[in-house]
Amino acid sequence: MDDSFLTARDFASHPAYVYPGYGSSVKRGPTRPLIPLKEKLRDQRVPVYGTEDLGALDHDLTRNAMRNGEPLGERIIVTGRVLDEGGRPVRNTLVEIWQANAAGRYVHKNDQHDAPLDPNFLGAGRCLTDNEGRYHFLTIKPGAYPWGNHPNAWRPNHIHFSLFGEHFGSRLVTQMYFPGDPLLAFDPIFQGTPEHARDRMIAGFSLDTTQEAYALGYDFDIVMRGRNETPMER
């Protein structure tokens, strides 16, 4: 990487470690000054993944857990570019996603709320970015779900993202939301992000990405660091 393009991480664009409206952050967020850790060689190493490390259907959540039919719900295409602070593509980096199903339930032992599981949907996928830094997923639009943070609390439709970027020390975990979701105004996880940076977590509907008579398309670019970096998940 050309050091002339490096910029400081914009901490003012990220959620605070402790946000009063978000109960879990109050319980687990640090309350004492942070201690800087000296960067180690292992933090600077580039994670290497090849196509042989991924399954042919890892990017297609509508088929990678299929048992006896297609999963229920609205099919969507989610695509975008992973960029560094200079706007250059981050190539061959691993992008992982996980999400609830169309009914708003995760395949996880701790998710026991009253919504059905889909036997044909796992809710997890991964892919590598191409030479333009682009990733591509086919999935089902996730449903909203109750989460008990406050009375009548519901999480907006969202997809979790994990990216390693150019080295292990640059890993980013964030969430992607959908345009026009009325629950965004009431969600303390989304609202905990500074207002000027919230739009960076909302995908844009794209008719160009939409596949006719099959799936709606959403574009979601991710910037790993710098002045326009995508806010991280706390």
Q: How would you describe each model-predicted region?
A:
Residues 1-234:
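Beta-strand-dominated extracellular/periplasmic modules and repeats
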